[in-house]
Design a protein with these regions (language model features):
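Short hydrophobic segments within beta-strands
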Residues: 49, 111, 143-145, 228
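FMN-binding flavodoxin-like domain, especially the glycine-rich phosphate-binding loop
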Residues: 59, 70-108, 112-115, 157-173, ...
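Short gly/ser/thr-rich secondary-structure transition/capping motifs
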Residues: 6, 29, 124-125, 172-178
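Catalytic core of the metallo-beta-lactamase
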Residues: 2-67
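Conserved hydrophobic helix-helix packing surfaces used for dimerization/oligomerization
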Residues: 23, 46, 140-142, 225
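Short, charged N-terminal beta->alpha structural module
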Residues: 143-165
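Short N-terminal or domain-adjacent regulatory/targeting segments
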Residues: 109-136, 210
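Active-site-proximal loop/helix segment associated with metal-binding centers of metalloenzymes
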Residues: 32, 52-87, 131-136
């Protein structure tokens, strides 16, 4: 395409003076495009951060993060954005953060989402955790797939027993009705995950298989996990879930597989309690 004759081509380390403002440029490849670049205004100490520090969601009049309830209304979407778009590229995000931390920044202006002018360190710390695959919260999340409701029941019973053991804020998700982007974000947030899945055509229920491959593709690591399978004749879901999980880095996987044959039986509650013990020790 035609390029305007007055266009100035810039590269890493270049600066442009517009009077009192001096703009410096730095490449942040794969955050989230290969050619991504940020701009720093040394006079106002503003970092124009491109997609970094952005979120899903549209502004509703207020443009600054300190003008909204960011923790309650925006943080989940900020996490979901970062981990789903560049979760795989923790290294490049770390490189971008190292460049940013050498600057005296008073304001961060992302391409989308609120502008940051207060508590910058708090949000930068979130990026530090997300890009190093460090869990934010000491919570258990149970993710299940269920065909007839029996695996769902087992997941709910397990969640109740986790609560009885003192676990706070246990979350339970049906992978068939929850968009994978939310589940990936929850897996990045929590430090412990239980996957419950029925055997389907000698394999995994498709929604659970998709989720596990999404987690692997986004480089999830450093989690404590357990699996629960359901299968009446030849249950194989547990083995296949573990095969995918074992390919992820630094995962602590519960050795035993709890097998439900059609419906959870009372004499299997002790097996659920062993998962609870593993998750809470």
């Amino acid at each position: 395409f035609d390029v305007d004759a007055h266009a100035v081509v810039i590269k890493e380390g270049d600066t442009i003076s517009t009077g009192k403002h001096t703009l410096a440029f730095a490449m942040i490849p794969m955050v989230h495009w290969p050619e991504a670049m940020v701009t720093y205004d040394a006079y106002d100490k503003v970092l124009f951060s491109a997609d970094a520090f952005g979120t899903f969601g549209a502004l509703n009049g207020n443009v600054f993060a300190d003008e909204v309830n960011f923790k309650e209304e925006w943080l989940d979407d900020a996490r979901r954005y970062l981990v789903n778009i560049v979760g795989k590229y923790g290294g490049p995000v770390q490189s971008a953060l190292k460049k940013a931390l050498t600057l005296d920044i008073a304001m961060i202006c992302p391409l989308h989402g609120p502008i940051w002018r207060e508590d910058l360190g708090w949000f930068i710390d979130k990026y530090q955790k997300w890009s190093t695959y460090t869990p934010e919260d000491h919570n258990v999340v149970v993710m299940y797939a269920s065909i007839y409701g029996n695996t769902e029941n087992a997941a709910d019973v397990l969640a109740g027993r986790l609560a009885d053991a003192g676990e706070k804020n246990v979350k339970v998700y049906d992978v068939s009705v929850t968009d994978p982007s939310y589940l990936v974000a929850e897996a990045f947030r929590c430090d412990r995950i239980v996957f419950a899945c029925p055997t389907y055509n000698a394999g995994l229920f498709p929604k659970m298989e998709t989720l596990l491959h999404e987690l692997a593709a986004h480089n999830l690591q450093k989690r404590k996990v357990a699996v629960l399978e359901n299968g009446t004749w030849a249950p194989t879901a547990g083995k296949q879930m573990k095969e995918i999980l074992s390919g992820m880095k630094d995962m602590e996987i519960y050795e035993e597989t709890v097998t439900v044959k059609s419906a959870l039986k009372e004499d299997q509650l002790a097996q659920l309690d062993k998962i609870v013990e593993f998750m809470t020790k």
